[in-house]
Amino acid sequence: MSESLQSVLIIGGSGFLGLHLIEQFYRHCPNVAITVFDVRPLPEKLSKYFTFDPSKIQFFKGDLTSDKDVSDAINQSKCDVIVHSASPMHGLPQEIYEKVNVQGTKNLLSVAQKLHVKALVYTSSAGVIFNGQDVINADETWPYPEVHMDGYNETKAAAEEAVMKANDNDQLRTVCLRPAGIFGPGDRQLVPGLRASAKLGQSKYQLGDNNNLFDWTYVGNVADAHVLAAQKILDKSTRDDISGQTFFITNDSPTYFWTLARTVWKNDGYIDKYYIKLPYPVALTLGYISEFVAKNILKKEPGITPFRVKVVCAIRYHNIAKAKKLLGYKPEVDLETGINYTLDWMNEDL
């Protein structure tokens, strides 16, 4: 551990990734003070996959766009590093993404600079480079798309650019991590969505040919990468190598897209004898029709959209050589073990 790391402030620490960030800092940096800033408190009941004591974690409830709220948390935590993992879920209105991902991040950067925080680690997304086309072994030299596919990744890219622009080796050092396809214990979006679709009888349908490799990443590995980044960005021997850089974070073992979903469904007892396969062009057409009808006639969110079809059917895997070399990152939990942990957590019924 870097001797400089004494205190970490985790923005969004009550969320899915946030709880795993607390856990990994607790495990790997036992002498580091951990503070959480979030709009919601830490959960009262935790899965067995979390060993930290919530009562030992200093907590601040606040608004990321409030100078005062952020200043209070930074001043009282006396943090060396801020880990900013707060972000709304997919599928929400654009104004929410703008407020949290863009305005909130810019406010956090401004306050951190004024209060002389040493470093900030930002949780970006591998989706910031996705334009609907195949992403094959992409590295950090790939550009942002001219037109983003969705509001979430558009604002994550804008926030990432702001974080990179704020990097100053004489003041606030910054680094961005781009995890892909996060899953694991505590997930409240991917797994619940899969379970809901199975209950509606949708597990028998397959969009695309399932020949597309996809990066699923175990959440504990993503949290490990953040701990490494926080340590490296304070270490005098490594900080110049990672300051102002972006890093893809994956399990380094892309698998066919539907593998994870069918493993979850099988655990729940949904074992389909056959699949109704919708070729990509057909699925995409249905996506456009569904989106039009839902928004213009039914006045509700569509169940299937062109964006979702493209995400499901595209090849999307990334090269993590840079993270291995400069962060010393390697996925400690393999894909099969991560899926088993997730299934075990699902059966806890928390």
From Swiss-Prot:
It is a peripheral membrane protein. InterPro entries: 3Beta_OHSteriod_DH/Estase, NAD(P)-bd_dom_sf. Pathway: Steroid biosynthesis; zymosterol biosynthesis; zymosterol from lanosterol: step 4/6. The active site is at K156 (proton donor). The gene is ERG26. This is Sterol-4-alpha-carboxylate 3-dehydrogenase ERG26, decarboxylating. It comes from Candida albicans (strain SC5314 / ATCC MYA-2876) (Yeast). One of its GO terms (molecular function) is 3-beta-hydroxysteroid dehydrogenase [NAD(P)+]/C4-decarboxylase activity. GO terms for cellular component: endoplasmic reticulum; endoplasmic reticulum membrane. It holds the Pfam family 3Beta_HSD.
